[in-house]
């Protein structure tokens, strides 16, 4: 074999060996990657729907890095699938309520840029609670705050912050609204936002940050909604809306919404005569609301919503210690569970209550005539026995010398049960405090507890003489 042939032979053998090594390396790489990906493969949903790993549903952002012959392969482990809330756990057993949050918005407004608001409420997603309110399009230390006692102007917007964070200049304006409701279905937020002319308002339904549906006024007389959280069960959210007279017959309808789309509308049925500003809570498998009768009754209407068949029933809270303001004194007040009591029914205030077996927990102003003070208590038999008046576990939330306002309920799911919480609106400014030209509020929040608790009073606390005019 001559030298040239030797060179060719050696080169061919080397090339063959190199090719074999290269193919083996590829085989090893493919096998390793296949085994690695198979190990962390996510189970597909039963309906074979594509489940993208979007930031809004990732609970833990874990990355696996595997080094193979100087090649880096990254694969994100699929997160736990997010499910609709069903609220099927039992209601927590409580002995009363413990302090939870206070935002001190009015006190902070004396030296900072804080929004002028009213109609606040609280609602929670599966991991965190938020406070909402209807802003007046201005901060308090601003001449635009003059005459903000008016409810419906085109500049009002729904504000949203983490609970305990006052509505500062960086606060998100969720939508245009002078009446609203919000709730989280387990996957995303739904906001119901009403704005427009009194005789031809529009309700916009915003889901996951996008406008999905809308509905116009059906009675041409101030379309309005709850001013507290709506409730979603297995992807169906319910919201109570009223259009019509505030001191006479009105048209109340219950809307059923799925991912922002109206799927059904049911008229109010049952014995309730007038229903506004409902405070709703999940009562699996349905939704229960305690509302405001602004026409005939100082006892509060109850609206029961069947999420499965869209049926509605209504009546009144049985407790003879009634929850609205104004009202008769406790010795002369009445409720027969079925009808309005025709006791100082016109005007009223938003409030709440919830059933506990045959009993009822409730909150109300301490004053029977005005929005002053705030108290909570349990009425034995107050859910099932007409005119029951046996009161236990009374607590003062705001003493009678200080102003209160609207109040409402929200629910929080723990590992074993569903807790009930409430907020109280602490109104300041006009009409009562005429030194200033504005009207605004702060809030205080309490939640149910199975423990012991003390006493106190948690008013707004701002010195009106130190406030901007």
Curated annotation (Swiss-Prot):
Compositionally biased residues, Low complexity: 331-343
GO process annotations (BP): carbohydrate metabolic process; viral budding from plasma membrane
Membrane topology: Single-pass type II membrane protein
Residues that coordinate or bind Ca(2+): 293, 297, 324
Intravirion side of membrane: 1-9
Gene Ontology cellular component annotations, sorted alphabetically: host cell plasma membrane; membrane; virion membrane
Family the entry assigns: Belongs to the glycosyl hydrolase 34 family.
Residues annotated as transmembrane: 10-30
Description of how the protein assembles with itself and partners: Homotetramer.
PTM per Swiss-Prot/TrEMBL: N-glycosylated.
Cofactor(s) recorded in Swiss-Prot or TrEMBL: Ca(2+)
GO MF annotation, one: metal ion binding
Chain positions covered by the region annotation Head of neuraminidase: 91-469
UniProt keywords, alphabetically: Calcium, Disulfide bond, Glycoprotein, Glycosidase, Host cell membrane, Host membrane, Hydrolase, Membrane, Metal-binding, Signal-anchor, Transmembrane, Transmembrane helix, Virion
E.C. numbers: 3.2.1.18
Annotated localization: Virion membrane; Host apical cell membrane
Gene encoding the protein: NA
Record's comment describing the protein's domains: Intact N-terminus is essential for virion morphogenesis. Possesses two apical sorting signals, one in the ectodomain, which is likely to be a glycan, and the other in the transmembrane domain. The transmembrane domain also plays a role in lipid raft association.
Region (Hypervariable stalk region), start-end ranges: 36-88
Organism: Influenza A virus (strain A/Qu/7/1970 H3N2)
Function: Catalyzes the removal of terminal sialic acid residues from viral and cellular glycoconjugates. Cleaves off the terminal sialic acids on the glycosylated HA during virus budding to facilitate virus release. Additionally helps virus spread through the circulation by further removing sialic acids from the cell surface. These cleavages prevent self-aggregation and ensure the efficient spread of the progeny virus from cell to cell. Otherwise, infection would be limited to one round of replication.
Reactions this protein catalyses: Hydrolysis of alpha-(2->3)-, alpha-(2->6)-, alpha-(2->8)- glycosidic linkages of terminal sialic acid residues in oligosaccharides, glycoproteins, glycolipids, colominic acid and synthetic substrates
Name recorded for this polypeptide: Neuraminidase
Virion surface topological domain: 31-469
Chain intervals for the UniProt region annotation (Disordered): 326-350
Activity regulation as described: Inhibited by the neuraminidase inhibitors zanamivir (Relenza) and oseltamivir (Tamiflu). These drugs interfere with the release of progeny virus from infected cells and are effective against all influenza strains. Resistance to neuraminidase inhibitors is quite rare.
Catalytic center residues: 151, 406
